[in-house]
Amino acid sequence: MNEVFDRERTRTRTAELVAALPAVEWITDGRVERLSQDFYWFSPVLERQLRGLRADAVARPRTEDEIRTVVAGCAAAGVPITVRGSGTGNYGQCMPMHGGVILDLSAYNRLLWVRPGVARAQAGIRMMEMDRQTQATGGEHGLGWELRCVPSTFRSATLGGLYGGGFGGVGSINHGPLASTGNVLGVRAMTIEPDPKTVELRAPQALLLHHVYGTNGLVLELEVGLAPAYPWLEAIVCFDGADAGFDTAIAFADALASAPGIVKKSVTLLAAPIPDLLLAATPLLKGTMSAGSHAVFVLVADFAEPAFQQLVAEHGGTVTLRKTPAEVRASNRTIVEYTWNHTTLHALKVDKGLTYIQSGFEPGRHVQQAKTLRDKLGDEVLVHLEFIRTKEGAMNCSGLQLVRYTSDERLNEIMQIHRDHGVYIANPHVWRVEDGKQGQVNPDIVATKLRFDPQGLLNPGKLRGWAERERIVADAAAGRVSLATLPRF
C-alpha cells in the first residue's frame, strides 16, 4: 500500500469503526487533539512542521481481545494506526501523519510476572507502577527488584513507550541503553491484518521493533531484565568558577561514574547557567544550588555515601542537597525529574528561546570532547551530560545540550560542529526514523514491517525505508543483503 491516504475516506471509515465496535472505549471529543501529540514542541523545527496533526479517533483497549478487534477492523478498512503509550516522547513519534486511529495502550497495563532479575508486563504499564510492584517482591528485609533504566518521565511513561521510542535513562550508567544485550529478553507482538496473529520474538530479534516509533510492529508484552532495588541516596554537588569550576565538575562526574566500587544509579552534569534556569523554573529547588554554579545530580546507594563523600572532598565540591532514601519516599519527589529530558522541559519554562540537541561522545575522549566543544560554542550551547555505559560496556556520556535557537541553519551548523569533533548526533529536529538516531535505512527494520504490517498501516510516513521495500526484498532474494531471521507466522 502506498503511504498516500485519502483523509476524507479515512475519517469516514474511522467513524464506521467506532460505530461498529461499541464494546471498545473510544474517544472522539476534544481530548483527541491532546492524545495526538507528544513533546514535539521541544523543537522549533518540528513545532512548525507537525502542529495541527490529529487522529480521527482514539481507541483505549483493556484486553488483548479488544486490541485484536480494533486492529482487525483497521486492517480490513485500510485505516492507519498510531500506537501510543503516554505520549511523553519527542519528535512526533506518536503523532499521526495521516489521521486514522490512535491505539492508546495505557489501559493495557498489567504486570504479568516477576522472577529474580526478570519481569514480564503488558506494554501500557507505567514504569513507576511496575517498579512499585517489582520492588515489593523483596519482602520485609529483601531488596526487591526495579527496572534497569527509566526515563525522567517514569511517573507516566509506559514500558512499551520506552521500548518503542526511547533510548535509555536513569540506570543506564550501569546497564547501558535499552538495546544492550540482556536488557530486553523478549516481546510479544501482533500483526496488522484482518486476522491478526500474535508472535513471540526472543532476543536479539526482539530488538527489531525497538526505537522505531511503532512503525514495524505492535508490541503487546515485554520481558525485561531487572536490577536490585537499592535504597538510593540523592545529592546535588556544586562547583563554583566559570571555567575551572566546569573542569572540576566534569572531572568529578566522570570519576564518580567510572568508580567501580561505588554503587550508583545516575550521574548528571548540568553546567552553568542551567542550574540557574532550574532554580527559576521551580520553587522546589530553592536553596539547593548556588547561583552561577555547575551542578552534578547524583543517585548513589546509601551504603556508598562515605566513598561518594570522599570523591566530593577530593574534587573540592560542595554537597548542596542531600536526601536519604526515606526522605525521598516521604516527599514523593526525586531529583531524577530534573535530569534527562526534564532538564529541557524546566528550562523551556524560563526561556522559550531554547531548544536542544542529542549527542553521543566517544568513550575515552568524552571529557576532552565536552571541554573542547564548550570552549568553541560558548554560551550558545549549554552543557548537559548524562553519564552512561555504551552497549559494549565502556563508560561514556550522552549529551542533551541546550541550544539558544536563532535559526534552523545555525542549529544544523551546531550539530555539524559536534560531528566534526567526533561526537555523534541523534537529530531531535526530524520526525522520520532514519533521519534521527537510526541514521540510515535499515533493511531488517523494513523487512520486519513487511512481515508484521504488510499494508503499511502502522504510523505511516515515519519510516523512510518503507518506500524502498521492493528493492530490499529484491536485494535479499539476490543475496546482496542478509536479513534477520524471524520465526514462522
Predicted regions and their residues:
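N-terminal flexible segment immediately upstream of the FAD-binding catalytic core
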Residues: 1-72, 88-118, 279-285, 330-351, ...
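Conserved glycine-rich FAD pyrophosphate-binding loop
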Residues: 4-5, 54, 79, 86, ...
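General beta-strand structural signal in soluble alpha/beta enzymes
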Residues: 26-30, 59-61, 81-85, 103-105, ...
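FAD-binding subdomain of flavoenzyme oxidoreductases
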Residues: 127-128, 132-135, 142-255, 484-489
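Helix N-cap motif at beta-to-alpha junctions
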Residues: 242-245, 298-306, 362-366, 403-408
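Short amphipathic alpha-helix segments
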Residues: 246-279, 363-380, 407-415
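A conserved active-site cap/scaffold subdomain adjacent to cofactor or substrate pockets
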Residues: 264-265, 273-323
